[in-house]
Amino acid sequence: MSAPHLLVGNIFFAPYTYGGATIVAEEVARHLALDHGWQVSAVSAVSRADLPAYALRKVQTGPVPNYLINLPPGRSYAAHYSNPQVTETVSRLLHSLAPDLLHLHCLQELGSGLIRAGREAGVPVVVSTHDFWWLCERQFMIRPDGRYCGQSPVRIEGCRGCVVDHDRARTRARHLARALAEADLVTYPSAFARDLSRASGLGARADAVWQNGVTLPGPDFADRQAARRARDPRLTFGFCGGPSQLKGWPLIREAFAPLTRQDFRVWLVDGALEGSWWQDVPLKSLPGDWQVRPRYSQGDMDAFWAEIDVLLFPSQWKETFGLTVREALARGVRVIQTDSGGTVEHAGPDRDRLIPVGAGAEALRREILHALDRADRHAEPVPVTGFAAQAEALVRLSAPLIEPRGVWPEDLSQENALPRDMAPLAPISPRARELVEEIAPARQRAHRA
């Protein structure tokens, strides 16, 4: 059998990299291409005024070509979850590329019609969920007041206080449930996400927990970490969540404020695309040495984590996975965290010290003081799934879908060829400002609200 051809679908893809799910999609695709010899293509979205609406353009960074669909502004509510024009464009792409497998990640803005496009093209479809988009119009089960929804199971009748138009939200929920049921395989990043989705009525022909990978530490990380600790032995806390109630910032501020000691540092990661999350947040009155640091990339994260001894993760909602938690554990960084859904499904230390979601600042303060005073300040690294292992797991999961197809066609007919006017896209800013402003406000709100 020839190496399979995989078409990956995600709202973002390199060079428009944004969010943890995009990193997962890109890294798994890269490892499938480099480690397993798969041919991998991607389809994603862009929003540019200099291109016609729904124009298809191709750009490539690394081993994976990315076919970009230009989404125009002013799309309807329904087009955000089911867009016939996007579906038709992807159908043409499927007939032209003739992949052996369609792997769909985050489909907000692209729409669930990609599942139907795969089915009609005779291509097996795997859908990998990363958040609660299939259950929640607001994507993260965050209420308008910035608090976690808490429904378990999720029932559309319980969404009346959150959505603007309950009838259209009900239509959306029914449409997405029917669409997802047509997938050959649905994967979830945690047992928590799978169980909540099942209980809430989402089903598929098959489902599985497919745990996300992370970028593992480099071979010199332990030396870099030891050198930093020798240079500055103060315990350093790190917080990557932004100044939002949902991520626990008010609890952190309240927990540290009454401390009378100064023998620690706190690094706050700034993930803003423009400006700063922290520019209007007063920090000078807090005890200890507080610094705001720029967000790290996959390539330079070891430099950041070498400075951190304890990750603060007081999330006030039930998340599906928690990439940051795994990045920390893989590097011997302790984690102070709440019992926040899929983020706790790991083998890290201190699992008996999880803080209940909704507990006050005093509970977090006790854990901070325990971290400062404990004799065993530094933990050993914990085995964590990397992207190579995650790609290997996908190979195993998808084998029953791909193997019956045999050799995929190498000669494409003129009838199915892509349009001749689909020239390579001109250079694109990797910041992807227009696209993020148009498509990803919900994730930014989760960190700032």
Question: In which residue ranges do the predicted regions lie?
Answer:
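N-terminal subdomain of nucleotide-sugar transferases
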Residues: 1-55, 121, 257-260
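Conserved donor-binding/catalytic core segment of Leloir-type glycosyltransferases
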Residues: 7, 187, 228-247, 253-256
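A short, active-site helix/loop in glycosyltransferases that binds the activated sugar's phosphate group
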Residues: 163-206, 216
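Glycosyltransferase donor-sugar binding loop
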Residues: 240, 265-279
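Nucleotide-activated donor-binding/catalytic signature segment of Leloir-type glycosyltransferases, i.e.
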Residues: 278-299
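Short hydrophobic beta-strand element within catalytic cores of glycosyltransferases
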Residues: 310, 334-337
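Conserved acidic donor-binding segment of nucleotide-sugar-dependent glycosyltransferases
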Residues: 349, 353-362, 369-375
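A charged, aromatic-enriched C-terminal amphipathic alpha-helix characteristic of glycosyltransferases
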Residues: 373-424
